[in-house]
């Protein structure tokens, strides 16, 4: 519920080459020790160059955010009618009331609450963050996000249905100066001896290139052989206003491309291949922003011949936002329409 976003090549070759020649062809030192001074200057130059290169590398974010640019412009459609009322009770506490009427998802009322703490690490981020929603039957979705230091952040999510914890997940991210290390534990159970552990590492190689890997390990009685491990390699390349990102592993291939064509238009392309299911899906999406009209439109089409889009229009000066959603599947010959109103 909140908004968040060069190494100097110089001439290192000459300094390193001179130093190398000096080592290969040693000569008697003159009485004024000029060679020592020159060698020391060359070494200092190399050290300063390496320091400048390291300083230019920034934290690459997490592997979870690898495809974020492309995913953010894709339309999230809904069916039926939805009304949401957001009310801020203070600078740190907000509540929401949502009424949903649909034939696809369960209809009814949900109450939500969000608390943002006072521990600030940037002008746009404060911790801890507690958010969740609950329906009259007691089904609960809860999330807790806390940043313990400038580099260490933890996220916990849990889902409760019919008085039972059906899903839980704890993620810890350590953000170094030019790398991020993440560890996730999901659905651990000492009664069934099952769970999922995922380790991720992402390293900035150059200011434009980040490479990393992911290891997922699952164990339990329902897993073939009682345990399975999947290794993947990930990467992201940024060039100006475009971003290439990809994941390659035993389970399949996932490639995304994002381009900011202008201040009003963003486009993205995604190809996801599952080796286990022996299928691929390609998606082309775009987002149009018209600030003067208070309008945002997200649309797209995929290789399954589905066309989808969401239109969001802010009804200024009133604190209302109108949302219209549509999805058409030409293969199955069905159409879903949604209409929503957000107040506050």
UniProtKB/Swiss-Prot annotation:
Record region (Disordered): 1-44
InterPro entries listed in its UniProt record: Porin_dom_sf, Porin_Euk/Tom40, Tom40
GO MF terms held by the record: porin activity; protein transmembrane transporter activity
Subcellular location: Mitochondrion outer membrane
Chief localization: mitochondrion
Domain of life assignment: Eukaryota
Alphabetically ordered keywords of this record: Ion transport, Membrane, Mitochondrion, Mitochondrion outer membrane, Porin, Protein transport, Transmembrane, Transmembrane beta strand, Transport
Tissue: Ubiquitously expressed. In the male germ line expression is detected early in premeiotic spermatogonia and is persistent to the end of meiosis.
Quaternary data: Forms part of the preprotein translocase complex of the outer mitochondrial membrane (TOM complex). Interacts with mitochondrial targeting sequences.
Family from the record: Belongs to the Tom40 family.
PANTHER family reported in the protein's UniProt record: MITOCHONDRIAL IMPORT RECEPTOR SUBUNIT TOM40
Job description of the protein: Channel-forming protein essential for import of protein precursors into mitochondria.
Record protein name field: Mitochondrial import receptor subunit TOM40 homolog 1
């Amino acid at each position: 519920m909140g908004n968040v976003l060069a190494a100097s090549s110089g001439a290192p070759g000459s300094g390193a080459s001179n130093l190398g020649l000096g080592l290969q062809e040693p000569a008697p030192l003159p009485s004024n020790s000029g060679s020592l001074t020159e060698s020391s200057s060359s070494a200092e130059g190399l050290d300063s160059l390496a320091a400048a290169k390291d300083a230019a590398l920034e934290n690459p974010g997490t592997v979870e955010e690898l495809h974020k640019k492309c995913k953010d412009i894709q339309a999230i459609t809904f069916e039926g009618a939805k009304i949401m009322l957001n009310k801020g009770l203070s600078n740190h506490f907000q509540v929401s009331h949502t009424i949903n009427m649909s034939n696809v998802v369960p209809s009814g009322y949900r109450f939500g609450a969000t608390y943002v703490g006072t521990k600030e690490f940037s002008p746009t981020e404060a911790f801890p963050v507690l958010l969740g929603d609950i329906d009259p039957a007691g089904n609960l979705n809860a999330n807790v996000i806390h940043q313990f230091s400038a580099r260490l952040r933890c996220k916990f999510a849990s889902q409760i249905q019919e008085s039972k914890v059906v899903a839980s997940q704890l993620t810890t991210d350590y953000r170094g100066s030019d790398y991020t290390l993440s560890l996730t534990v999901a659905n651990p159970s000492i009664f069934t001896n099952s769970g999922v552990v995922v380790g991720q590492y992402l390293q900035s190689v150059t200011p434009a290139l980040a490479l990393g890997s992911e290891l997922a390990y699952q164990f339990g009685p329902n897993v073939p052989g009682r345990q399975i491990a999947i290794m993947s390699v990930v990467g992201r390349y940024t060039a100006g206003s475009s971003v290439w990102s990809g994941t390659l592993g035993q389970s399949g291939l996932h490639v995304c491309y994002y381009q900011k064509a202008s201040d009003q238009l963003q486009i993205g392309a995604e190809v996801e291949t599952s080796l286990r299911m022996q299928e691929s899906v390609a998606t082309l999406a775009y987002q149009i922003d018209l600030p003067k009209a208070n309008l945002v439109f997200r649309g797209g089409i995929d290789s399954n011949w589905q066309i989808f889009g969401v239109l969001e229009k802010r009804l200024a000066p009133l604190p209302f936002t109108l949302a219209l959603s549509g999805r058409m599947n030409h293969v199955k010959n069905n159409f879903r329409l949604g209409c929503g109103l957000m107040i506050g």
